[in-house]
Amino acid sequence: RCYQRKDIHITDFYFLNTSGTGGGIENLSVGNQKLSLAIIQDGEDQNGAGYIADARLANIGLWEDASLEVALGINFSTESKNGKYDGDDGLLASGIIHQNMSNGFNQTVVQVGTAGYGIQMANFWGAGAYYDRSGDQNDASGYRVINWGVMNLGENWEMGHQLAYLAGSDLGTTKYDSSQYSIVARPMYKWNDTMRTIFEAGYNAGEVDDVDFGGAKFTVAQAWAMGDSFWARPEIRVYGSYLMDLENDSFGEVKNDTGVVTAAGTDNDFVVGIH
């Protein structure tokens, strides 16, 4: 099942997602807080099977209109009779501060991961499941700090944003270090109850083992939705996006089976579409 997934809508990014086959208790009242405990299977192969022990405590009161949720995931395995995993168990700890405001909300997320969770926390694709035990990542550690939210900026304007910093050391089986940051803003102007114009700007840059990378995107879209809310769905969107590779010429680049570039690319591209 989809188990208490946490995502950032404007970047389609799940920062905590341990969904899978399993069981447990959910939203058990402990005073004013809500406790959830679960055991979830996380892959199986000839060497054995992986599992996630997931514990969460939500609705911890802080200051006015603010609450804290803490989550701990422990990824452990059982080995088959003749099986052996090179990867150790990993820990994933998360803290989420949710702040309600008169014109929207804001969340700040802090996450730390060890071993196979280190590489997940240092990237935008890791959320807690699909733990890799195929190699030794046992000294790895990673973390990320994220701030995001949605707010009204007047009668006709709404905006979503995401700020993120991610870093890690001794990642993967090659033991590399990495760091990166990302800035995304999506303002939306509402013409009426169904039609809106959406603007989006995003920037991502960092380095992997002292090699820089970076990219940016600018999008303009005309959209129609069933309602005037930022979250109104379904939505039909006609868009145009300008993409930039700030360090390389990767757009349209062609590589052979061994990874050698056989046709050079460019450092920018423009795409249009409808969805």
Curated annotation (Swiss-Prot):
Q: Where is this site: Greasy slide, important in sugar transport?
A: 105, 231
* Organism in which the protein naturally occurs: Vibrio parahaemolyticus
Q: Which reaction does it catalyse?
A: beta-maltose(in) = beta-maltose(out)
Give the UniProt record's GO annotations in the biological process aspect: monoatomic ion transport; polysaccharide transport
Its subcellular locations are: Cell outer membrane
Q: Which family does it belong to?
A: Belongs to the porin LamB (TC 1.B.3) family.
Q: What is this protein called?
A: Maltoporin
SUPFAM superfamilies of this UniProt entry? Answer: Porins (SSF56935)
